[in-house]
Each structure stands twice: as structure tokens, then as C-alpha cells.
């Protein structure tokens, strides 16, 4: 049966979405709406006109919590009256539940943010992040709920004493969820340490559009340089210092390497300093944030993709590189070994091992034939296991199974 037929009449709430959404969430929303699923996006942002005319998609504006205390209380009062008109019993219940729930935010803020959902109904409520499910825990009693476990909120944040509320909130949300989506087997095993019942979990791996991300139709630049690329937020868990150390080793070995970094983040200054301190200014190009078209252009001009992460679920950036026909050197963080088979689509090396990264890149530089072989294998792997259309179908089946 076609996916669109299977999904007929299904109404799904995406709760706690920032705007604009992450690229992978935007792709999922569009994939679902194209299959006949009605998606309501709950966001404090203001989607632009292009999103507001997408068939089968509507927006539920949720209140922010900025401004003076008086203005926040005034907004909360107005929302309370509107919610009580829709359903007074549900409004009272929401107030009681937020007082019983532990969080890093005040009960008043959480109550205010719950009010837009009072008196409204969906077949399934979807939480793209663990923290969102914890924040909106009372919503999980309104409809069957699904939570996504993606990476850092499972394998990093629970170790932070300042985020004990997240660690302690995982088990209650797992118990209430009708199903839990994990981006990899590795993330599923990590989540099991915090109370996930594996029997209610489903692994649906990240995906990309191989029609968009594809090898260049013409030859790659051939000026003698070995072009290595990486994309991702400039944050500590991406391990950029280890990548730069590997590049430094290649330079010392006489490899004419050019390392391109695409992305921005909280540690931009640290990245700039490290490039300067390692005297890599002539070998590293930091593009900052680029448009999707700009990212594609740089991927198609590269010779290899490097992922130096300390923590991952499965990197969408790596899948985009593979779809463009690039061999990959990746750490074994999280579920990366589920996406890249060592010696087939690239090389899998230990985390924090700049020497192993350098050795793998050196092998790819010395052997253009191996680059082509691994790049072709990577694209075939994406076509077989990581197609965006297959991922959307899998989510439709998951939502339908709990509705």
C-alpha cells in the first residue's frame, strides 16, 4: 500500500520546534505532509509565507517568555482565559501537573507554555528532542506520544550535574511514551541506561536526499591540493582540535592539504585561535555558515570528508558527503560505525586519535583510486540505507502504529 494511503487522516503535533527548524526536521515535516499526514508545528517562531502555504501543515504559535515580569504575567493571564474557555478541567489539570514536575524552568513559565495546547486534539504528539518531552511532560497524557533520541541529550547532557533535571526526566518520559525513536543502535543502548524499554523503541536512521546531494557532473578541481572538508556546529563535541592536529601532521609530512570547515557555533573564537596557534592559516579555510547550495558546492569540490566528533548520533553531514561521492574518515563516536563500514565507505578511527585520522587521510591522498572506490561505495550505501523518502515512509508507519 502506498505511504500516502496508509497515512490518510493522521494528524501529528510536532511539539517544541524552534524556528527556523533544523534542516533534518524541515525535511521530515515536508516528507510527512507530502504523504498526506497533517502536521501541526508548535513553535514560538513565525514561519515565513512559504511554509504557511504548505499543504497539510499548520502552525500553533506558543508564547515566549521574554519581556518584563509584568508583561509575561499579562500574557499568561490572557492565555489562561483562552484555555479555560476551550476546556476549564484541562486547564486546571495542566496547572496541577506542572507543579508536580521538576524542570530547570519555573512552574509559571511551563504552565504558560502548556496553555495553547489545552482543548486541542491530535492523533499523535511527536517530541523531536528528549528535553522537549521533559518540558512538556503533561502533554503526553493527551495523545499517544513519540520521542526522538538523537545524540547529545542522551550521551552527553546526562553527565552534566547542572542538567540533572534532564537525566532524571528521561525515565518518566520513556515510561509515558507510546514509542521511542532512536537514530542509531548505539543511541538506543545509551538510552536503555536511563530507563528506555527496548521493546518500545524503533531505530530510524538519519537520511538525506541523494537527488540533491550528488557528485559533481564535471571533474573535481585538480590543482594538486588535497581538499578535505567537514561541516557542523563549532562546539566542543565536534572535536575540531583533533581534526586540526591531523591536518597539522599532514602539513608536516609535506601533503598539500586544504581543510575546509563549514559551520558556526559557541566556540568560533577557540577555533580561530587554534588555527592561528598551529600555524595552519595557509591550509585551513573556515567558511562559517553557508546556504544549502553553498554547502553542496563545497562538498562537490572536495576529495574527502573528515568527522572528528567526540559524540554523535549519526551525522547527517557525513551522509551528505557520502551522497556526494566522498570517502569518509570518521571517529567511532555514537552510531557512526553503523553508517560507515571501516575499509568500505571510508575509515573509522578512535575518538581523540589525531594520529589515526592523519594516517587514514594520508592513505586517501596517496591513492586516488581508493578515494574513487570508497566514494562510490558511500553513495551506494546512501541509496540503499539512508534515502530521505524511505525515512519519511518509516516515520509514517511509526506514527500510524501508535495512533
Spans of features found by a protein language model:
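Membrane-proximal helix-turn-helix segments that form the acceptor-binding/catalytic region
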Residues: 112-119, 160-180
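Acidic anion/phosphate-binding donor-loop and adjacent secondary structure
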Residues: 157-160, 192, 198, 208-224
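Aromatic "clamp/platform" in nucleotide-sugar-dependent glycosyltransferases that forms part
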Residues: 310
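Short hydrophobic beta-strand element within catalytic cores of glycosyltransferases
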Residues: 327-330, 340
